[in-house]
Amino acid sequence: MLKIIIPTLMLIPLTWLSKNSMIWINTTAYSLLISFISLPLLSQFNENSLNMSLTFFSDPLSAPLLVLTTWLLPLMIMASQHHLSKEPLARKKLYITMLITLQTFLIMTFTATELIFFYILFEATLIPTLIIITRWGNQTERLNAGFYFLFYTLTGSLPLLIALTHIQNLTGSLNLLLIQYSTQTLPSSWSNAFLWLACMMAFMVKMPLYGLHLWLPKAHVEAPIAGSMVLAAILLKLGGYGMLRITMILNPLTSYMAYPFLMLSLWGMIMTSSICLRQTDLKSLIAYSSVSHMALVIVAVLIQTPWSYMGATALMIAHGLTSSVLFCLANSNYERTHSRTMILARGLQTLLPLMAMWWLLASLTNLALPPTINLVGELFVVMSSFSWSNITIILMGTNIIITALYSLYMLITTQRGKYTHHINNIKPSFTRENTLMALHLLPLLLLSLNPKIILGTLY
C-alpha cells in the first residue's frame, strides 16, 4: 500500500516546486502514473499476502475502489484547469494540494485494517472536501451547502465511534482481518438494535439514504467541478464500502433490522428518480440521479446475498465513473454558457457536435445500457432483490423506466431543440475535454469484458 500512498504524498512537494507553466502537466502525468501502479492490485487475491500489513491491506472489495480513487485524481486535475485559469499561482497550487490530500485520505480509508483508524480517516476526508466546496464554489450559497454537508455527516457518524468502542470492549479487537473469525452472534436486544443503528447510520447518511439525502444536491450544486467529481465518484462509495465491511460484524441483526431501511431505499429510489424529471438545474438533476443509484446499492447490501454483494460493488464502481463524466459534461456546458439552467442552454448539438457524442454515450451509460458495467451491477441487484421478495420487481422495473426517461430528458433538453441566441459565439470543445470524457468512458466499456475484477470479495 505504501507504494501508492507515498508517491501520492510526494505529489504535494511536486506541485509547490513546479514552475508556473508546468503545474498541470506535472501533476496530471505523475498522478496518472500512480494510477497505473495501482492496477496490479486488481489481480491479487486473498491468498496473496504481499499487500497486507498491520495497518493497510487490500482485498478484492477495496482494490477496485482504490483504483477508482487513483484514476480520478488526474481526471479532476484535467477538469479544473479552465476554472482556475484566472486564479493566482499560489491558489492553484493550494487547490491541487487539497485534491492530493483528499486522495491520500481516501486511499488510506479504503485500505485501513483497523476500524477506529478507518473511522478517523473517514472523518478526515470531510475537511479537504469542505475547503474545496466553501472556497472554490461558484455561488455564495456554498457556505450553506458546506454547513449542510458537515453537519449531516458528523451527526450521522458520531454514534459510530461510540459503537466501535463498544465492539472493541466486546471482542477485544477491531482488526478487520481478525474480526471475521472472532465475531460472536449478537443476541437480539434493545441495546444491540441501537448498536446496529449507530453502526449503519453513519454510512447511510454518507450514501445517502432517502430522507437523509438533503445535503447531497446542495453540496453538488455548489461545489466546483473537482469537488463534484470526487463527491459523486468516491465519497458516496465510502458509505457503501463501510456498510459492506461492518455488516459482517453485526450478524444476525441485519436480517430483521434492515426492513425499514430497505423500504425507504426502494421507495426513495423511485421518488428521487421522479424528482429528476422535474429538475431545471442540470447539476441538481445529476445529484438526484446519484441518490437513486445509491439507493440500489443500499438495497443490495441489506439483502445480504452473494449476488447482491457483487451487484453492489459493481454498481458502485460503475456509478462512480458515470456520475463523474456527467458532472464533467455539465461543467463544460457551464463554462461556455455560464448557466446551469437547462432551458437556457438548448440545442448545443449544432454548436458542439463532438460533445453531443459524449453526452449521448454518458446518458446511455447512466440508464444502464449494455455493454456497460452499469448493466452488470443493476442486473445483479434486480435479480437478488427479486429472489428476496417478488414484489420488488414492480419497484425495480418502475425505477429502471424512470431512469431511462430522465436520462433521455437530460440528453434532449441540452442537445436538441433550437439554440437560444445568447450562446451563438461559444468556444469549441478542447482536446483536454475530449480526453477527459474518453478516460471516463473507456473503463466503463472495457470493464464489461472482464467484470470479475470489480465484483468484490465473493466472486
Curated annotation (Swiss-Prot):
UniProt key word Membrane: yes
One Gene Ontology biological process: electron transport coupled proton transport
InterPro entries assigned: NADH4_N, NADH_Q_OxRdtase_chainM/4, NADH_UbQ_OxRdtase, ND/Mrp_TM
Keywords from the UniProt entry: Electron transport, Membrane, Mitochondrion, Mitochondrion inner membrane, NAD, Respiratory chain, Translocase, Transmembrane, Transmembrane helix, Transport, Ubiquinone
Keyword Cell cycle attributed: no
Membrane topology classification: Multi-pass membrane protein
Similarity comment: Belongs to the complex I subunit 4 family.
Record's protein name: NADH-ubiquinone oxidoreductase chain 4
Species per Swiss-Prot/TrEMBL record: Ceratotherium simum
Gene name of this polypeptide: MT-ND4
